[in-house]
A protein has these predicted regions:
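Polytopic transmembrane helical bundles with strong interfacial aromatic enrichment
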Residues: 1-124
Length: 124
């Protein structure tokens, strides 16, 4: 499981690099500066939580056989958070349809849950 988590976190971080470059170079003449900022916020949070998923993977590697379900839940929540939070910001910026706005806080909630599960693992 740890290797899969490391693979997914690396792919997610790599995708964030691609999306960040796209925001900086490919979107300048296509969407407003405000929407580019929204898009880049999605990129930032995707980066942060890609690294968080890597921390989960490393924690599983350090723990050896003593693998915690809390870490698995942390990984799942970080992944869902990226999809909902960053994904909704990408869609909002690209389509400018406000319907995607309410999805963003749900992603934020999953980020918070991920950090709670990650923290609980280390205090148990």
């Amino acid at each position: 499981m740890a290797k899969l988590i490391m693979l997914i976190s690396g792919l997610s971080a790599g995708l964030a690099v691609i999306l960040g470059a796209f925001a900086s170079h490919g979107l300048k003449k296509k969407i407003s500066a405000e929407m580019i900022s929204v898009f880049k916020t999605g990129v930032d949070y995707q980066f942060y939580h890609s690294f968080a998923m890597a921390f989960v993977g490393l924690s599983l590697m350090v723990g050896g056989a003593d693998q915690s379900n809390l870490l698995t839940w942390a990984f799942i929540c970080f992944g869902i958070g990226i999809i909902f939070f960053s994904g909704s910001l990408y869609l909002l910026a690209l389509t400018q349809k406000k319907i995607f706005g309410p999805i963003t806080p749900l992603g934020g909630l999953f980020f918070i849950l991920g950090w709670v599960f990650f923290s609980l693992h280390w205090i148990n």
